[in-house]
A protein has these predicted regions:
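Short, membrane-interfacial amphipathic segments enriched in basic
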Residues: 1-9, 149, 192-203
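Aromatic- and glycine-rich beta-strand/loop motifs that create alpha-glucan
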Residues: 1-29
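Membrane-interfacial helix-loop-helix junctions in multi-pass membrane proteins
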Residues: 15, 46-47, 180-234
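Residue-level recognition of transmembrane alpha-helices
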Residues: 26-27, 56, 60, 79, ...
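Hydrophobic alpha-helical transmembrane segments of multi-pass membrane transport proteins
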Residues: 32-37, 53-124, 156, 169-172, ...
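Transmembrane helix segments
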Residues: 36-44, 157-199
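Alpha-helical transmembrane segments and their short interhelical loops
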Residues: 95-168, 217-241
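Short cytosolic juxtamembrane segments of multi-pass membrane proteins
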Residues: 242-249
């Protein structure tokens, strides 16, 4: 399975490298949001920190991932509609390799996007006191979040009837950081909005990453964040597998 998955992964990565504008496009939106919030709104937002880009970066990284996984749906949808998926199914390869290749491609592509966003944040003044273990923990959380959303993206990629349908699911995911602690403290929100913000996955993930990067108190946020990621991944994997079995006929 590993060798077959590697071959399929190589095919998808070559497609991405032939059109690097995909990664650039995915990175541009969160970078533009970061520029807008830091240089236009940053002075008016009270977060209790002097460096707003430090406060903002964790949420921007999650937004970049949410934007990036949408391309998983697109790539899978194109494989299905072009008949390439049907050809793969007839080949002597383990069928799960087909989906895992798309999942790993999403993981690699999002790593590249995250690196680009962090480099831009460094130019804007981002600084962290995190040690190597903290950074590894941050990488682990971001990786789990990417895998969770990628398996979620597999479902519309297999079931959508149009390109628009394959990408539309990502819109709520990109919007979630706006109703979380990503941009402003939840304490400043109206009660109903605050109740939602404090009990959705992005807030706990953002808080955990922020604490790891800036020597804060991680507390239960990291376990809640991991529970959200694992829960979304398991549920998405289950429904993606069912959708794939229907695709196999």
């Amino acid at each position: 399975m590993k060798s077959k998955t590697g071959v399929l992964l190589g095919r998808l990565m070559r497609n991405i490298m032939r059109s690097p504008d995909t990664i650039i496009t995915v990175a541009i939106t969160p970078i533009m949001m970061m520029l807008l919030f830091v240089y236009v709104f940053g002075g008016a937002i009270k977060t209790g920190t002097e460096n707003y880009v430090n406060y903002l970066l964790p949420g921007i990284l999650l937004m970049a991932i949410a934007s990036g996984v949408a391309y998983t749906s697109v790539r899978l949808f194109m494989d299905v509609k072009s008949g390439l998926m049907a050809r793969f199914i007839t080949m002597p390869i383990k069928r799960s390799s087909i989906l895992w290749a798309h999942v790993l491609t999403s993981l690699v592509a999002n790593v590249l996007t995250i690196v680009v966003v962090i480099l831009v944040a460094l130019l804007m003044g981002f600084r962290s006191s995190a040690n190597i273990l903290d950074w590894l923990a941050v990488a682990g959380i971001l990786g789990m979040f990417t895998l969770a959303l990628t398996w979620l993206a597999i479902i519309p990629g297999l079931k959508a009837r149009s390109m628009e349908g394959a990408t539309a699911y990502s819109y709520p995911l990109v919007f979630l950081p706006f109703i979380s602690s990503a941009f402003v403290p939840t304490e400043t929100m109206p009660k109903i909005v605050r109740a939602f913000a404090e009990n959705q996955p992005v807030t706990s993930i953002v808080n955990a990453i922020r604490a790891l990067l800036y020597e804060g108190t991680v507390g239960n946020d990291i376990w809640i964040a991991l529970a959200w990621c694992v829960g979304i991944m398991i549920i998405s994997y289950f429904f993606a597998s069912k959708a794939f079995k229907r695709q196999l006929g």
